[in-house]
Amino acid sequence: MLLLITGASGMGKTTVRKIVAAQFADQLESAELAEVAGPPEWSLRWRHQAVEKAVQRAVKVQRDGKHFLLCGDPVPPAEVYAAPSADQPESIAVCLLDASEDSQRLRLMDRGDAPSLIPNHIAFARWMREHIANPRHRLDVIKQGGWEEMQWDRWITATDQQKAWKSHRIDTTGLDPVDVGELAATWIRQQMLSIRHQPHFPNKKAPQPGLGSKQALPAIPRLW
């Protein structure tokens, strides 16, 4: 199974990854995009290609009997589902780390982010919030200038199947990082327990032996 814990900047992705990776060390492998795709080029095309490499890693880890967690980058769920190899993991599950705009702004200021970029991060958080609720919302934001190998048609078909779009939101506003980590860990446990009852793509090929059975707005500033 591929688990995606995502969110805009300032939502606590890196901290959460450290917490859950330690708890599930014997059950899952975790990584950020740069760890599977090399130094970032900060382009949409690079991110799409990096997501595909992460999906391929998830498939490899799956063959070894573990799950794979992608956490640490602001990856929109649609990019995972549209990756060329996204029909190969036994399941995909998405968790969005979110927070109020005031909370996000304070976190970004406290960690020293450039004030001129903070409105961009907040706008992207709004987009991500809508994206997990409405998978087809403003897909132009992540399609234009992207990698031509992305399977967007397959992605649109998948969103017609309610069970193919599994997302969960954790509101981190006012929460201690450890508490957020525990909420994320609880979500991971729930996904592991229910994986056999969560179909991925409806017309997916039968798994190979050993693999198991298996969301008029202003323009959104790009952060990549």
PLM feature segments, named:
Residues 5:
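Hydrophobic anchor at the beta1->P-loop junction of P-loop NTPases
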Residues 8:
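P-loop (Walker A) phosphate-binding loop of NTP-binding proteins
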Residues 11:
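ATP-binding Walker
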Residues 14:
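Walker A/P-loop
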Residues 17-59:
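Conserved substrate/cofactor phosphate-moiety recognition/catalytic segment
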Residues 49-91, 96-101:
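Glycine-rich phosphate-binding loop used to anchor ATP phosphates in small-molecule kinases
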Residues 114-180, 201-202:
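Small-molecule kinase domains that catalyze NTP-dependent phosphoryl transfer to phosphate-bearing small molecules
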Residues 205-217:
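Positively charged N-terminal leader segments that act as targeting/secretion signals
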